[in-house]
Amino acid sequence: MPEQHPPITETTTGAASNGCPVVGHMKYPVEGGGNQDWWPNRLNLKVLHQNPAVADPMGAAFDYAAEVATIDVDALTRDIEEVMTTSQPWWPADYGHYGPLFIRMAWHAAGTYRIHDGRGGAGGGMQRFAPLNSWPDNASLDKARRLLWPVKKKYGKKLSWADLIVFAGNCALESMGFKTFGFGFGRVDQWEPDEVYWGKEATWLGDERYSGKRDLENPLAAVQMGLIYVNPEGPNGNPDPMAAAVDIRETFRRMAMNDVETAALIVGGHTFGKTHGAGPADLVGPEPEAAPLEQMGLGWKSSYGTGTGKDAITSGIEVVWTNTPTKWDNSFLEILYGYEWELTKSPAGAWQYTAKDGAGAGTIPDPFGGPGRSPTMLATDLSLRVDPIYERITRRWLEHPEELADEFAKAWYKLIHRDMGPVARYLGPLVPKQTLLWQDPVPAVSHDLVGEAEIASLKSQILASGLTVSQLVSTAWAAASSFRGSDKRGGANGGRIRLQPQVGWEVNDPDGDLRKVIRTLEEIQESFNSAAPGNIKVSFADLVVLGGCAAIEKAAKAAGHNITVPFTPGRTDASQEQTDVESFAVLEPKADGFRNYLGKGNPLPAEYMLLDKANLLTLSAPEMTVLVGGLRVLGANYKRLPLGVFTEASESLTNDFFVNLLDMGITWEPSPADDGTYQGKDGSGKVKWTGSRVDLVFGSNSELRALVEVYGADDAQPKFVQDFVAAWDKVMNLDRFDVR
């Protein structure tokens, strides 16, 4: 569908002809205008302050886990079933059942997930907000959510939209005869859209995300702006099933699905319902975010016929896949392989395939009792038949439908839970007992935890082991900072810092200190566990974090502060067999400004990548600032590089980073090595410090400099230590869903 309003354009330099960087006129802040209009390339620190507490109408004391636990899930299922099977005149149900629509709604909510940064997915209920609520691929899903309002209204705070959207899809499958694998509640609603990079394109269905032969830009997964997966008409509307198979494989891979899971999801999902392309697409009105006020948040209002029911237009494709569109069976594959196919067009002018030579005419039921139809398929459906790998998989299912049911159940379960993180976050009576490899399992605690006396003893042993403050802090940070708040993966729990692939990540300097630290901590663990009384044990994962805490206490003492860094035991150690190496590989940081590491192939300069990392760690701007300053003086840099170590007292927890960054006696200039680093020279012209773009941005950016001035003041040292320890403790426990 063409964009209703052309995007604002800029000149190549970002400045208008009169020297002003804004084209057109400035907008009021309430219209979205502001500093970013004047300086488009400035750091957007708002990405660190998303969904603030003041925006949450439920209040700080609200406990969603406690509320959702009170729901009678059987009664909820019946309520959703009633909605699904009660057609509404304002949006009539195809075949009298909204189940297929709800499956699409759930699929498209969860299907925005992508592996490279873990963003997207159903958590937070983001489908309610722009841009997702107005993506072309989500046309008419605004109606699906409105249909569910009576259910949401009834359960109120006990049931989030995020859970309801996905659970409705699960219920739809069950309602139409399919046995699902299970379901976990626990998705908490957010109250504003996430700031997520969905692509560089400024028009719907743009595809500037490709380079080379057909290399898709990271971290994106969908093929075009505004699509969830692939273009159902084929690549850029080219109805070539073999070419479409290439897009399908790459796109689904980037959403964590292998070939079997991909085929199962397509076959299973297209066993139900239909697409909608009853008439010309240019008769469809604007998406929800561009629709007139009086449409009350609904979009895509069509002037073709009644605009609904038999006249509905969504994708523009008019396909009914099976002769039993509200029943689980094997008819999709039977029809896919039972006919030869010819290229045709829908009434809306979209490419699709129809059974050749009129075969099967009249065998497909009309959704509203009209004459029977001919079998039809999408170009991407035929990909399952023409691609050799997909063909081998799906032909077997043609003869073994029970295998299809099993694979679809598991793939659907993965699809709708992939962004939820560990099973400790899954709530409710429908959670399966089985934990799957993609859920990054960690063993349950099977021993007594260490207490204060044991913790004190272990700290002493660690500090007496010969390991330095730098080594201990770096290792603990490397383990814990692998966490991603987007999909709740990574973190210190599991002790995977010593397993593949993490132990070999370049950012962890695998040929440097890491293996020595691992070996030493393992020796301490073995010695302690063999001598500890009763069933008291300590895990390697706990020792990694405890080592960092002990090192910080030592560094604080060196700076004149006697502190205790919080430590919460209870982490356990995963095995290599419990760790999917390929799946974990996408967690490898390509940049970590906290360690002054910048790998190759990053899309933005280092300071922007720092913000992205801080966002994934759910840090605020003050937390990010205090952590960078503290980690620099503790010597936690990648390969112990001197960049940003603005202190003469390394491994001492001082505020020297901030004090020296603000020193007006230092003049900064790019390094003659032309390697992206900078030299800070004193009045004599002597190089006193070296720094990276990440370091200097804290003095250059006005908002970050304001924070630096807090920690660089003469009275700031106690506050700096306090705030650093609090931020450190937060990062160390980001993955501890077992205790929060």
From Swiss-Prot:
It comes from the Bacteria. The record marks 104 as: Transition state stabilizer. Heme b binds at residue 270. GO terms for biological process: cellular response to hydrogen peroxide; hydrogen peroxide catabolic process. Transmembrane segments: none annotated. Formation of the three residue Trp-Tyr-Met cross-link is important for the catalase, but not the peroxidase activity of the enzyme. Its cofactor is heme b. There is a cross-link at residues 107-229 (Tryptophyl-tyrosyl-methioninium (Trp-Tyr) (with M-255)). Its EC number is 1.11.1.21. GO terms for cellular component: cytosol. Binds 1 heme b (iron(II)-protoporphyrin IX) group per dimer. The active site is at 108 (proton acceptor). The keyword Membrane does not apply. There is a cross-link at residues 229-255 (Tryptophyl-tyrosyl-methioninium (Tyr-Met) (with W-107)). Homodimer. Belongs to the peroxidase family. Peroxidase/catalase subfamily. This is Catalase-peroxidase. The lineage of its organism: Bacteria, Bacillati, Actinomycetota, Actinomycetes, Mycobacteriales.
